[in-house]
Amino acid sequence: MSSNNQNTNNTSIELISENGPISLNLMMEEGVKALTRILSNQLNDTPGTQPMHFIIKKNDKDNKAIDINGDDEEVVELGNESNYHMSDGVQNEAEIILNDQLNDILKNHESQLRLDGEEAEIIFDYETQGTVDGSDSIGEKITQMIESVLPNGLGPNTTGKLQAVLNGKELNITEEIHKSDRIEEEEHIEGGLTTAEGNFEVEFETEPLPEDHKHTEENIDGHENYNDCCPHHHNNQDNRRRAPKYKNYNYHDYEYTVQHPKTEPNFSALINQKKPVCLFCEYYMVFGEPPKNMIKWYNMHYGYNHLPQRNDRHHRNR
């Protein structure tokens, strides 16, 4: 195995028999279980060890002694049951094999494993990756990821700036805007405001002001008939420009006329109304009485403490 292959982490097991296939269950339960236990110590103690090649031979061949330093395959003697071969890469005799464990396995299951042929081999091929320092490598990866999203990188003072990034202090990523673009944007906003303001004035001035702010009492089935727009939508000449913002600001000043005897709701009064009226007046037109609870709620949220007051109250019905 070449040295550059030692940086992977792959493991493979292969069983080969000249007398036919070996049972997969037996391989998993016996062979792999034993070999995994045997090799676990070597994997933990010596990372980067070369693959091992185990060959189980027929017992009529000569037994050989262990040759740790030899260049050829090294043989481990397992009594009279079989010969156990191991390829180069073994570090010491203690890491080669646990003789008693593997010998018991082979003795108990020799007939089932069909080890009567000339040769059967088990290849336990593994490659280990030298474990790198986890904290440093992970930290380096995180630093690279953060640096890739920052406009100017982390700069020379990487540690301090990285800590600031993790604390949310260096995430003020701004987009560069040319001066000409900024001036053009400001002119566009100002032009839009001017246009909107002009439209507002024209629209408002075209709305006629009523001559009288009082309700006209033309009794239709006991309900009020509003031929003009609701007086609450209008103010005096000086304050009319603020009226749309506080369209209903003087509702709390208005006193509706004395209510008529209760009758059935008359929704046709809204059909005959040519101009829009406020919600309170709609209720008053339909039901013939002011919405006391609605006015109370409105005064609580938008009453004297929240909205400007009228100086003249000539619109109050007396």
From Swiss-Prot:
Entry's Gene Ontology cellular component terms:
cytoplasm; spindle pole
What is its subcellular localisation? Cytoplasm, Cytoskeleton, Spindle pole
Q: Which keywords accompany this UniProt record?
A: Cell cycle, Cell division, Cytoplasm, Cytoskeleton, Mitosis
**Broad class of the protein's primary localization:** cytoplasm
| One of the protein's GO biological processes | mitotic spindle assembly checkpoint signaling
Coiled-coil stretches are none
Described function = Part of a checkpoint which monitors spindle integrity and prevents premature exit from mitosis.
Belongs to which family?
Belongs to the IBD2 family.
Q: What is this protein called?
A: Protein IBD2
Organism (species): Candida glabrata (strain ATCC 2001 / BCRC 20586 / JCM 3761 / NBRC 0622 / NRRL Y-65 / CBS 138) (Yeast)
Q: Which gene encodes it?
A: IBD2
